[in-house]
Design a protein with these regions (language model features):
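A detector of single, family-specific signature residues
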Residues: 1-430
Length: 430
């Protein structure tokens, strides 16, 4: 994040810089080359494939242009098109040509400047991208490596599995609403272990009635479950007797719930495996285990934070982290009009959501952060609304994490409470 201002970015493009605009595709990429003033060196877009041979050919083309036009630096720019740019970006970085990214929205808005035409094609887009790079309208991507690369991948897998589990749970809930709505009066959670044991053998009310109280109880005894017995079995039987669930399509209904339960259990096993790996990776990062000592902060928060942020040493201060999360304060003012100050919501959305969730956890479980939240919402000067205060608590946690990770200090509850009395703490918040 160092030297990340627009002036610094513009100054990085000198007379000796070869600027590349690359239109990234799933299988084929197109590139055009320019100098720092926008004069093109490539007669036509250079086409190369998303393969090792294609990358080598692209590198040879770049080196030929560098030598021919006496350039000593290459700045390749591209749009972050899904995941398609990852391999090309890593190849360029490994060959000492650090890629930069331009905002796709900026590309879309800028492509009419030259010809007043919104046409999108493989020749036009690389030129627009290169133009944005020359103007310093780019961002320097962070490509994690080592333990941070593993942690980000594992964290992404965790989020995907949790999303799949949520979808499966919703489908199971739908199944109950259709075939056995009374089940939810017996079990508050559809995934209760004793309930799932019964569902595997007797999913429909008529199946449960066939088993009877003794049959239901025997299933639990065979599974060595002691927390449930005939009293719970009787409640389940009574619910089945008075069920208003649909009796049509019973054969398919049994198959559907069996498949859903199998999917649910398999995803849970995978999630546990991923969480084991995540815990091992977090332990490899210096001071990361200290973050877990903060009451209300768990392994999911720490791993998610480190996966999104990566190496903390690349940031100069906590404000850069705040900006990355989209929690930077932005003001909407003009002339005598002074608008509301809000958060930017520009940055890594998953990091922002994670911080918001942990802020709610901290306010509920951590005395120091609860006191901070109370101060924000009840102070005499400029009290914050609850949602605004949670954003301020999230920003405070960023500062705490940053100091602990960069300076190697332990969490200090007394200092945390002492910070509340500082007048500079969020006079205005999102």
């Amino acid at each position: 994040m160092k030297s990340n201002t627009q002036n610094a970015k513009i100054e990085a493009i000198t007379e000796k810089t070869l600027v590349l605009g690359i239109d990234v595709g799933s299988e084929t990429h197109y590139a055009r080359a320019f100098d720092y003033r926008g004069i093109e060196y490539s007669k036509k877009p250079f086409k190369f494939s998303n393969t090792e041979a294609g990358f080598v050919t692209f590198k040879e083309w770049i080196l030929d242009l560098k030598e021919k036009h006496e350039k000593d630096k290459v700045v390749p720019g591209m749009e972050p098109t899904g995941h398609y740019w990852f391999n090309l970006g890593k190849f360029l970085q490994d060959n000492e040509m650090k890629p930069v990214l331009v905002n796709p929205h900026h590309v879309k808005k800028s492509k009419e400047l030259d010809d007043n035409n919104p046409t999108k094609n493989d020749r036009k887009d690389p030129k627009v991208i290169a133009g944005l790079v020359r103007e310093g309208r780019y961002m320097i991507p962070y490509l994690p490596d080592g333990v941070y690369a593993d942690l980000r991948t594992a964290s992404n897998i965790r989020f995907q599995l949790q999303a799949e589990l949520t979808r499966i749970q919703n489908r199971i809930s739908r199944w109950f609403n259709i075939y056995f709505p009374e089940y939810k009066t017996v079990y508050g959670r559809p995934d209760a272990k004793s309930g799932m044991l019964i569902l595997k053998q007797a999913p429909l009310p008529e199946d449960i009635l066939t088993l009877g109280i003794d049959g239901v109880n025997q299933i639990w005894r065979d599974a060595k479950m002691r927390a449930v017995g005939k009293a719970r079995a009787k409640t389940l039987i009574e619910a089945a007797e008075h069920s208003v669930g649909s009796k049509e399509g019973a054969i398919s209904a049994r198959m559907e719930i069996r498949m859903l339960l199998e999917d649910y259990e398999s995803r849970n096993i995978r999630l546990q495996e991923v969480m084991t790996l995540i815990a091992e990776l977090v332990n490899q990062i210096p001071m990361a285990e200290k973050l877990l000592e903060i009451k209300g902060v768990g392994i999911k928060t720490v791993s998610g934070f480190l996966a999104e942020v990566g190496d903390i040493s690349r940031f100069n201060n906590p404000k850069e982290l705040q900006k990355l999360a989209g929690l930077a304060l932005v003001e909407n003012s003009s002339g005598n009009h002074k608008g509301r100050t809000t958060i930017s919501r520009r940055g890594r959305k998953r990091l922002r959501y994670l911080l918001f969730e942990v802020a709610m956890s901290l306010v509920a479980k951590n005395p120091e952060f609860r006191e901070l939240h109370t101060y924000y919402t009840t102070r005499r000067l400029n009290p914050l609304k609850k949602m605004q205060s949670l954003m301020a608590v999230a920003a405070k946690l960023i500062r705490v994490f940053y100091v602990m990770l960069t300076k190697g200090v332990d969490y200090d509850p007394k200092k945390m409470v002492g910070d509340i009395k500082r007048p500079a703490v969020y006079l205005q918040a999102a």
